[in-house]
């Protein structure tokens, strides 16, 4: 049989979500079964050709006239389609989806295919020829009739219209694959299983198309009516429900891999147990929508055996009516093939039931064989090769629904957990809640708004699982911008629904919307009706939203009024000495507010801190639904420690955040995600477990206080007294009426009754003893008096119950998300292998949660059952209930271990306190108590905070955080600005400017900074003083050195003078002696001459004597002077000595020789008469000497001055030389720097060349150092330069100080230049 070459054209479907879906079919290889069938078909074709040769020439002419060229048929189809309004919508959608280039390519392909099809024979003509030949066959030939019946079932085409587009698709009954015959032929006695059918050459896209055709889409309007909701408001997923079967068949396969996580042992060899088949179970009914026109009721069996070829006496008219109905449907949809096909089909069916009785028996057998496989499907490719594979998959799906799905239903109803609940417009996928979930009225309203359509389960495959958001990182430092976002995130708030599954990105949404589907398509009128209905729904939803907003605004106004009232009352009561809120109106309002809002969703101004010793209850639990009046009495006693006005500002800021969150409930939020370490996750798990344990104990103890029998001990004592009096009266009656038998009988009865009363009294005594024991054990927690306001007490119980319900629900969601991640998001081989034996083990895995203590939380439903069975609570029942959780609860947190009327803070609670201080500061204790400590009061938190910060406490994390947290520059600037405005008022500064810093911490930082400044100033002053002292010392040392030099010079001069004087004295003495000798000689000579002249007659002896005497006189002055002469001589001698002593010596530094300038008195030799020198002459000589001496003194002073001037000149010259040397050194340094800069520039140029060799743009070499840059740093550099518009050294310094502290300014500058070069290169490359 010739095949038709056809291009993969997109089939478009507009689903109820207004999302287009298209896919392409791929060619498929042939299996050995298909080859056998092809051989059979070829044999049939040969027989048909032989029959055609036997036909009459008249029929051949008629058939040739009826034949039309394929081009004409295609043109007729296109004209009809273009005239239809649906085709226009189809073209618009294609233009929106397919780009123009692809459209042109598709048109070219279609034109090429038309040319190919013009050469090929037409299928319709072949069909007509075959049908005409069948009319002439012998009615008695059984084999030919059997073949004709098969061909009639194979070739009959039924056309249907699309749901929303104008494109048409043909539903062809494929070649049936009789799997039972195939199994029997291989001699294997078994049911249909995947192991005995070859799945290699199957087309999975056709399988998906088969699922889509047999499973109808449920519109949104009727989803609520069709869903079978349980008492919790969720869909019931029974395994035998049709909707659930549709849900299973809608699980898509795509490009997924193995889901076999745990074991893959017996996947191929598994054979399900045999069971009796019911005809009703094989039927796959198709849902007929109001707006969708289906062709006929397509079922797994067309009719029962009674109506289909079972008896001989079927009338041809009935069969013709049946066939005419199908043909009429065909005539409505396709006009060009209606005439030929109707006649031929009628001829085939008229001849199909003619035969003998043996033929009927054979037909019955064939019907039995074909019952399980006669399932129609949509053939998108119109290829005969894929017919067999589709029947194989249909058989496998039926086998799964009959066998394997029943076994899965017995596994604790796991599929009851697979209910899904999508958000608004299916943008956000939200995990479902379990069936055993305890829900409030608010939660039920939210969950019933949106119910999952069956097809839209596909959207989950594109969602992204995200780890839960942690509360805070321990190194987290909040900013003013982040606080608003963080205040909206709560540990127990509504936004935890978004922690587990987030919305997929746009690309994934588009991919999910473009999944292959081939559902039946409706007419254009149905699409318009759907659009109108959607518009009406949108309008209704908008009206509802507006009404909700109005109601929220009204509630806000009421809250503000209440707040103003409470503030006014607070001011009034503050003036009183015995302060305290004791008004009844506030307690009434608190009870009203508790009904409107949940425990954790209530506003902060309505919440309050109840005390364990207060009037509300005897348990240390706080109900946040109550107003501030419950704990305000404690605030007045402790107002010295904590100021109350700090709480007002915090409440206002958090009100705004809550209002914003209420307005944006339905919007998709993008919460910031923080990564968690394993240690942090374990800490969170411990905190949740402790919180859960404390809540259960609080809940049970508060229930005990609702039973008045646990408190009325006095009534039981009165009953004891009455019973004792009755017993005494009965003994008296016995004594008085002992004679009468009747009286004795009555007395015996009375005694029996009295004995019963005594037993009861003994039991009451035992009960009282037990109650007293319980009160002794729980004396620090439970008061003996019942609560005064039972309404308020019941409200607190409800709030604690809500918290437990929320915790359980979050745990269930967390577990379900882990299950979905293993089932849905893992790869699957094919839809037939979705639930194999190994997968069934993975469907209900033992989930180990990292965030929850699952073993303890799973017991919560049993707690609810026990509470229902215990309407009259007591201490015994409480201990019985707590014994269930004994293995999972820690003894350190049991109430029996509590002492001194308060619970000790655990390590986990200390961590929660640290998280609260980081997030809300040290003034918002009430907010911290609401968010983190429902079982504590704000006063307890404040005292714990102070105890942890005290000097006596050990080192802890809170102390490390507050003492070790460094101030940033921004915080310092804020603090300086606040000090200028408010001074040293640390409370105001920490409240208004730096609320995450404690006042004591601010004070300590300020004092420490000022001390450091003072130390710096002192150090600078001391340095100045030291410098001054050093200068003075140096000056004094120089003066002393100069004085010492002068003294040394003076001493040297004195020594020289002494030596010179000593030499002068010796010379003078020698000269004087010589003069005297000369004088004596002269005198002797004169005397001798005179004597010779006078006495010529003297003897020679006298001469000798005279001569001897003269010679002797040279040594001895034997000359005798007179008185006057001696005096004059003595004076001369004294003068000479004085002159000699004072005779100066002038030394020149240039020469070592000494010059002596003396002016001694020269006494000319004269006779004795000349010795009589007058005093006047002597005085003149003395005056001359003095003048000479004065001149010498002046010369000496001039010499000293010259020497001093020379020293100064030398010093100046030395200073000038030093200055010159310094200048030379500076010049040398400058030259060196210039030389180094030149070298650096050369290195940079070389480095740039090396960088191009390295081909890495994020590396830079500066001063021989390789530096790595990130994109964020480059972005910061470019943005700052762009904002400031200039390039200065100040910019680089500011960047290195603030934003890029790891780099120097020079490195940043060179990186900027490098970036400019890279940008230029990229632009040049583009050009």
Swiss-Prot record:
<feature type="region of interest" description="Disordered">
    <location>
        <begin position="504"/>
        <end position="668"/>
    </location>
</feature>
<protein>
    <recommendedName>
        <fullName>Myb-like protein O</fullName>
    </recommendedName>
</protein>
<feature type="region of interest" description="Disordered">
    <location>
        <begin position="717"/>
        <end position="770"/>
    </location>
</feature>
<feature type="compositionally biased region" description="Acidic residues">
    <location>
        <begin position="624"/>
        <end position="633"/>
    </location>
</feature>
<feature type="DNA-binding region" description="H-T-H motif">
    <location>
        <begin position="925"/>
        <end position="949"/>
    </location>
</feature>
<feature type="compositionally biased region" description="Basic residues">
    <location>
        <begin position="555"/>
        <end position="577"/>
    </location>
</feature>
<feature type="compositionally biased region" description="Acidic residues">
    <location>
        <begin position="263"/>
        <end position="283"/>
    </location>
</feature>
<feature type="compositionally biased region" description="Low complexity">
    <location>
        <begin position="646"/>
        <end position="668"/>
    </location>
</feature>
<keyword id="KW-0539">Nucleus</keyword>
<feature type="compositionally biased region" description="Acidic residues">
    <location>
        <begin position="754"/>
        <end position="770"/>
    </location>
</feature>
<feature type="compositionally biased region" description="Low complexity">
    <location>
        <begin position="131"/>
        <end position="142"/>
    </location>
</feature>
<feature type="region of interest" description="Disordered">
    <location>
        <begin position="1061"/>
        <end position="1122"/>
    </location>
</feature>
<feature type="compositionally biased region" description="Gly residues">
    <location>
        <begin position="607"/>
        <end position="619"/>
    </location>
</feature>
<feature type="region of interest" description="Disordered">
    <location>
        <begin position="263"/>
        <end position="390"/>
    </location>
</feature>
<feature type="region of interest" description="Disordered">
    <location>
        <begin position="131"/>
        <end position="153"/>
    </location>
</feature>
<feature type="compositionally biased region" description="Basic residues">
    <location>
        <begin position="533"/>
        <end position="542"/>
    </location>
</feature>
<dbReference type="InterPro" id="IPR052435">
    <property type="entry name" value="YY1-Transcr_Regul"/>
</dbReference>
<keyword id="KW-0804">Transcription</keyword>
<feature type="domain" description="HTH myb-type">
    <location>
        <begin position="897"/>
        <end position="953"/>
    </location>
</feature>
<feature type="compositionally biased region" description="Low complexity">
    <location>
        <begin position="511"/>
        <end position="532"/>
    </location>
</feature>
<dbReference type="InterPro" id="IPR001005">
    <property type="entry name" value="SANT/Myb"/>
</dbReference>
<feature type="domain" description="Myb-like 1">
    <location>
        <begin position="959"/>
        <end position="1010"/>
    </location>
</feature>
<dbReference type="GO" id="GO:0003712">
    <property type="term" value="F:transcription coregulator activity"/>
</dbReference>
<feature type="compositionally biased region" description="Low complexity">
    <location>
        <begin position="322"/>
        <end position="353"/>
    </location>
</feature>
<dbReference type="Pfam" id="PF21227">
    <property type="entry name" value="Myb_DNA-binding_7"/>
</dbReference>
<dbReference type="GO" id="GO:0006355">
    <property type="term" value="P:regulation of DNA-templated transcription"/>
</dbReference>
<feature type="compositionally biased region" description="Acidic residues">
    <location>
        <begin position="585"/>
        <end position="606"/>
    </location>
</feature>
<feature type="compositionally biased region" description="Low complexity">
    <location>
        <begin position="1061"/>
        <end position="1118"/>
    </location>
</feature>
<feature type="compositionally biased region" description="Low complexity">
    <location>
        <begin position="722"/>
        <end position="732"/>
    </location>
</feature>
<keyword id="KW-0238">DNA-binding</keyword>
<feature type="compositionally biased region" description="Acidic residues">
    <location>
        <begin position="356"/>
        <end position="374"/>
    </location>
</feature>
<feature type="compositionally biased region" description="Low complexity">
    <location>
        <begin position="1144"/>
        <end position="1160"/>
    </location>
</feature>
<dbReference type="InterPro" id="IPR009057">
    <property type="entry name" value="Homeodomain-like_sf"/>
</dbReference>
<dbReference type="GO" id="GO:0005634">
    <property type="term" value="C:nucleus"/>
</dbReference>
<feature type="region of interest" description="Disordered">
    <location>
        <begin position="1144"/>
        <end position="1168"/>
    </location>
</feature>
<dbReference type="GO" id="GO:0003677">
    <property type="term" value="F:DNA binding"/>
</dbReference>
<dbReference type="InterPro" id="IPR017930">
    <property type="entry name" value="Myb_dom"/>
</dbReference>
<keyword id="KW-0805">Transcription regulation</keyword>
<feature type="domain" description="Myb-like 2">
    <location>
        <begin position="1268"/>
        <end position="1316"/>
    </location>
</feature>
<keyword id="KW-0677">Repeat</keyword>
<feature type="compositionally biased region" description="Basic and acidic residues">
    <location>
        <begin position="543"/>
        <end position="554"/>
    </location>
</feature>
């Amino acid at each position: 049989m010739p095949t038709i070459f056809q291009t993969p054209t997109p089939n478009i479907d507009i689903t109820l979500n207004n999302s287009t879906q298209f896919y392409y079919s791929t060619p498929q290889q042939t299996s050995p079964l298909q080859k056998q069938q092809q051989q059979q078909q070829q044999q049939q074709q040969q027989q048909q050709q032989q029959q055609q040769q036997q036909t009459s020439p008249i029929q051949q002419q008629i058939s040739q006239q009826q034949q039309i060229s394929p081009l004409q048929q295609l043109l007729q189809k296109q004209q009809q389609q273009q005239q239809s309004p649906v085709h226009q919508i189809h073209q618009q959608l294609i233009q929106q989806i397919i780009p123009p280039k692809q459209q042109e390519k598709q048109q070219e392909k279609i034109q090429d295919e038309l040319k190919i099809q013009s050469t090929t024979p037409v299928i319709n003509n072949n069909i007509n020829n075959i049908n005409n030949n069948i009319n002439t066959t012998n009615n008695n030939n059984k084999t030919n009739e059997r073949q004709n019946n098969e061909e009639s079932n194979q070739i009959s085409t039924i056309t249907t219209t699309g749901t929303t587009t104008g494109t048409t698709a043909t539903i062809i009954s494929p070649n049936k694959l009789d799997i039972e015959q195939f199994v029997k032929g291989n001699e294997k006695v078994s049911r249909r299983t995947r192991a005995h059918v070859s799945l290699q050459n199957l087309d999975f896209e056709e399988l998906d198309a088969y699922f889509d055709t047999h499973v109808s889409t449920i519109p949104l309007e009727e989803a609520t009516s069709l869903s079978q909701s349980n008492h919790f408001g969720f869909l019931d997923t029974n395994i035998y429900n049709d909707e659930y079967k549709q849900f299973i068949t809608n699980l898509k396969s795509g490009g997924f891999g193995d889901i076999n996580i745990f074991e893959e042992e017996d996947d191929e060899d598994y054979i399900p147990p045999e069971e009796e088949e019911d005809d009703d179970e094989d039927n796959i009914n198709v849902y007929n929508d109001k707006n969708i026109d289906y062709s006929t009721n397509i079922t797994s069996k067309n009719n029962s055996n009674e109506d289909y070829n079972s008896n001989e006496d079927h009338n041809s008219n009935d069969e013709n009516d049946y066939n005419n109905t199908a043909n009429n449907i065909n005539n409505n949809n396709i006009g060009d093939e209606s005439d030929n096909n109707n006649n031929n089909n009628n001829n085939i069916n008229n001849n199909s039931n003619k035969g003998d009785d043996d033929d009927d028996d054979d037909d019955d057998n064939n019907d039995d064989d074909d019952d399980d496989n006669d399932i129609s499907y949509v053939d998108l490719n119109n290829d005969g090769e894929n017919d067999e594979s589709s029947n194989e998959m249909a058989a496998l799906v039926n086998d799964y629904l009959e066998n394997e799905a029943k076994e899965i239903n017995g596994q604790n109803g796991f599929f009851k957990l697979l209910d899904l609940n999508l958000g608004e417009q299916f943008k956000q996928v939200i995990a479902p809640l379990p069936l055993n979930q305890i829900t409030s009225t608010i939660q039920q309203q939210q969950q019933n708004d949106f119910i999952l359509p069956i097809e839209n389960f596909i959207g989950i495959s594109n969602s992204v699982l995200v780890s839960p958001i942690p509360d805070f990182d321990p190194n987290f430092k909040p900013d003013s911008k982040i606080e608003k976002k963080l205040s909206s995130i709560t540990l127990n708030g509504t936004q935890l629904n978004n922690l587990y599954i987030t919305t997929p990105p746009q690309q994934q949404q588009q991919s999910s919307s473009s999944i292959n589907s081939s559902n039946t398509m409706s007419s254009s009128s149905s699409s318009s009706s759907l659009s109108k209905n959607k518009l009406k729904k949108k309008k209704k939803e908008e009206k509802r939203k507006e009404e909700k907003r109005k109601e929220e605004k009204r509630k806000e106004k009421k809250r503000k009024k209440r707040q103003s009232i409470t503030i006014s009352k607070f001011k009034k009561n503050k003036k009183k000495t015995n302060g305290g809120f004791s008004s009844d109106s506030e307690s009434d309002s608190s009870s009203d507010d508790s009904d409107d809002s949940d425990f954790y969703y209530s506003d902060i101004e309505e919440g309050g801190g109840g005390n364990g010793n207060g009037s509300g209850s005897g348990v240390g639990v706080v109900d946040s639904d109550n107003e501030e009046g419950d704990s305000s009495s404690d605030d007045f006693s402790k107002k010295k420690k904590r100021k109350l006005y700090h709480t007002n500002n915090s409440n206002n800021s958090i009100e705004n955040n809550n209002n914003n969150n209420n307005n944006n409930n339905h919007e998709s939020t993008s919460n910031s995600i923080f990564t968690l370490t394993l240690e942090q996750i374990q800490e969170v798990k411990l905190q949740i477990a402790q919180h859960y344990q404390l809540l259960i104990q609080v809940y049970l103890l508060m229930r005990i206080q609702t039973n008045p029998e646990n408190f009325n001990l006095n009534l039981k004592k009165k009953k004891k007294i009455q019973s004792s009096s009755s017993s005494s009266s009965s003994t008296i009656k016995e004594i008085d009426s002992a004679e009468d038998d009747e009286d004795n009988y009555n007395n015996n009865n009375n005694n029996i009754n009295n004995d019963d009363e005594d037993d009861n009294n003994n039991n009451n005594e035992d009960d009282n003893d037990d109650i007293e024991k319980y009160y002794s054990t729980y004396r620090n927690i439970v008061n003996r008096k019942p609560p005064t306001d039972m309404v308020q007490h019941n409200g607190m119980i409800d709030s604690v119950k809500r918290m437990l319900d929320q915790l359980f629900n979050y745990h269930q969601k967390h577990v379900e998300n882990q299950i979905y991640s293993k089932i849905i998001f893992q790869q699957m081989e094919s839809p037939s292998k979705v639930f194999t034996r190994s997968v069934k083990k993975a469907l209900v895995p033992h989930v180990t949660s990292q965030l929850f203590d699952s073993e303890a939380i799973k017991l919560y439903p049993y707690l609810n059952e026990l509470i229902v069975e215990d309407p009259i609570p007591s201490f015994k029942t409480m201990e019985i209930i707590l014994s269930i959780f004994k293995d999972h609860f820690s003894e350190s947190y049991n109430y029996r271990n509590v002492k001194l009327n308060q619970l000790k803070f655990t390590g986990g609670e200390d961590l929660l306190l640290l998280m609260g201080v980081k997030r809300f500061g040290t003034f918002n204790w009430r907010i911290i108590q609401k968010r983190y400590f429902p079982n504590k009061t704000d006063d307890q938190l404040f005292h714990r905070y102070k105890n942890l910060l005290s000097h006596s406490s050990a080192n802890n994390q809170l102390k490390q955080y507050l003492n070790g947290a460094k101030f940033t520059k921004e915080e310092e600037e804020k603090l300086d600005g606040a000090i200028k405005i408010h001074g040293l008022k640390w409370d105001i500064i920490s409240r208004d400017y730096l609320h995450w810093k404690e006042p004591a911490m601010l004070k300590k930082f300020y004092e420490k900074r000022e001390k450091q400044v003072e130390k710096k100033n002192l150090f600078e002053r001391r340095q100045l003083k030291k410098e001054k002292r050093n200068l003075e010392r140096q000056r004094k040392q120089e003066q002393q050195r100069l004085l010492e030099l002068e003294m040394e010079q003076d001493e040297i001069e004195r020594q020289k003078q002494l030596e010179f004087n000593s030499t002068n004295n010796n010379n003078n003495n020698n000269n004087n002696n010589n003069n005297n000798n000369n004088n004596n000689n002269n005198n002797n000579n004169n005397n001798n001459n005179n004597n010779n002249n006078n006495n010529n007659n003297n003897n020679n002896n006298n001469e000798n004597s005279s001569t001897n005497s003269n010679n002797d006189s040279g040594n001895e002055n034997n000359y005798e002077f007179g008185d006057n002469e001696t005096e004059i001589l003595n004076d001369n001698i004294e003068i000479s000595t004085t002159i000699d002593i004072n005779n100066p010596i002038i030394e020149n530094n240039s020469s070592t020789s000494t010059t002596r300038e003396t002016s001694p008195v020269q006494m000319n030799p004269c006779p004795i008469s000349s010795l009589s020198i007058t005093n006047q002459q002597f005085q003149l000589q003395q005056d001359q000497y003095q003048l000479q001496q004065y001149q010498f003194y002046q010369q000496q002073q001039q010499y000293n001055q010259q020497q001093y001037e020379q020293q100064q000149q030398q010093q100046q010259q030395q200073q000038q030389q030093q200055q010159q040397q310094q200048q030379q050194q500076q010049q040398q340094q400058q030259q060196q720097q210039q030389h180094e800069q030149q070298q650096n520039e050369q290195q940079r140029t070389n480095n740039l060349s090396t960088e191009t060799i390295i081909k890495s743009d994020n590396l830079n070499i500066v001063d021989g150092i390789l530096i790595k840059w990130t994109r964020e740093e480059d972005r910061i550099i470019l943005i700052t330069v762009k904002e400031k518009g200039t390039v200065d050294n100040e910019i680089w310094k500011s960047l290195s100080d603030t934003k890029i502290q790891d780099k120097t300014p020079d490195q940043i500058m060179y990186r900027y230049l490098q970036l400019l070069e890279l940008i230029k290169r990229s632009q040049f490359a583009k050009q």
